Amino acid sequence: MSKKWFTYENGTVKEYGSVDKFPENCVGFVYKITNIQTGKFYIGKKSLYSNIRKKLTKKELAEYSGPGRKPTKKLVTSESNWMDYWGSNKGILQEIKDSSTDSFRKEILKFCFNKKQLTYWEVHYQCINEVLLTDKSYNDNVLAKFFRKDLVESE
């Protein structure tokens, strides 16, 4: 179900199939997934790495020497599932399941170098594309704070 990510700049297309091709110190990106047939789109963010707290093994606990209480867990950083990621919106995921990934284009809008940038640029692109005001967007909310249903004007 994997399909590569692309950037479109100044008429050139660049393909991203591995973390090595991303800019140095990049922690994630803001993306746009577009249904080519309908023009409907989804804007979101994705981190390139995830942190997992793993329990220390007996050997690691035995090797620990230091003041205070022994730690029980360690922080392990690993590459996220960014390559196979298709967003968190149930609507777009169902459409991908029903049709195929060939009907969709995965585009990187902005590379980000810390988590605050990642959140800011996601909200920026969602707002300038008016994701809650157009029927051409799969997005139902912005920041889990502003919802499409709350913006519908009642008569």
Locations of regions flagged by a protein language model:
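Structure-specific nucleic-acid interaction/processing domains
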Residues: 2-155
